[in-house]
A protein has these predicted regions:
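Serine-dependent carboxylesterase/thioesterase catalytic core
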Residues: 3-159, 221-223, 228, 232-242
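C-terminal catalytic-base region of ester-bond hydrolases, centering on the histidine
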Residues: 138-243
């Protein structure tokens, strides 16, 4: 059966999203992805509250669908849109309802949020969590000022490995081979793209490239982030501590 795809944008990203919807349609041939709008044109603090509120509404909308239709739904959420996906799936899981799948792009939700493990029960296929340890916005914006300086899922990936959540680390090199804009040449300068690497286009482009391939082939080393963006040191596998 053909999937029904809803794309949920992040903060201050309410459209148009024709370019992103086209990319998503290319990843899932035969589908017509739709934009799921929500009230995100506010301050960050208010938009976080709105994201949590709209997740309840979306869960109710999905729960009210005929089961056959709900089983075709794929949610794709970027940044706060990823947060909405997690909260929505958690509410569905509590009611023993499921959609087909969810794809998280740079999800702006703490990596220790209790709704994350609950969300695994809300999909039939594993959740794909595209994360980037080098995401500038998440690392220096969200990680430093958002929600008690707790590191986000979009940087660290899932803390507890689970067969229904597949972390896909996006390499920092994706910015070099992806155009950020089809119209503005300035936006395609490498310096601009590296700073703007939170943009959904980079995450979707990597997903498109890797569909059907080995996601781990060029994946970066995932280094968990601590509070205030202090990275845990990486110990060489040949080095052992002895008493």
């Amino acid at each position: 059966e053909t999937a029904e795809i809803l794309y949920i944008p992040g903060w201050w990203r309410n459209g148009p999203h024709d370019d992103l919807l086209t990319i998503i349609g290319g990843i899932f041939p035969g589908t017509s992805p739709r934009l799921y709008r929500w009230d995100n044109l506010h301050s960050w603090k208010q938009s976080v509250k709105n994201a949590d509120a709209v997740s309840v509404r979306l869960a109710e909308e999905l729960a009210a669908m005929p089961e056959a239709q709900r089983n075709r739904i794929i949610l794709i959420g970027h940044s706060l849109g990823g947060r909405i996906c997690v909260r929505t799936l958690a509410r569905l899981g509590e009611r023993k309802l499921r959609i087909r799948q969810a794809i998280l792009l740079a999800a702006a939700i703490p990596d220790d949020d209790p709704d994350i493990p609950k969300s695994f029960r809300g999909t039939a296929a594993p959740i794909l969590n595209l994360c980037n340890p080098y995401d500038v916005t998440l690392k220096y914006g969200y990680g430093s000022f958002g929600e008690q300086m707790r590191p986000p899922l979009g940087i660290n990936g899932c803390r507890d490995r689970h067969p229904l959540c597949f972390d896909i680390p996006v390499p920092d090199t994706i910015t070099a081979c992806t155009n950020l804009s089809d119209r503005n040449r300035l936006m395609n300068l490498n310096a601009v793209k590296r700073v703007a690497n939170h943009h959904a286009r980079f995450y979707l482009e990597y997903l498109r490239q890797q569909i059907g391939n080995d996601f781990a082939a060029d994946a970066p080393l995932m280094v968990p982030q601590d509070k205030v963006n202090l990275e845990f040191p990486v110990m060489d596998r040949k080095l052992f501590w002895t008493e």
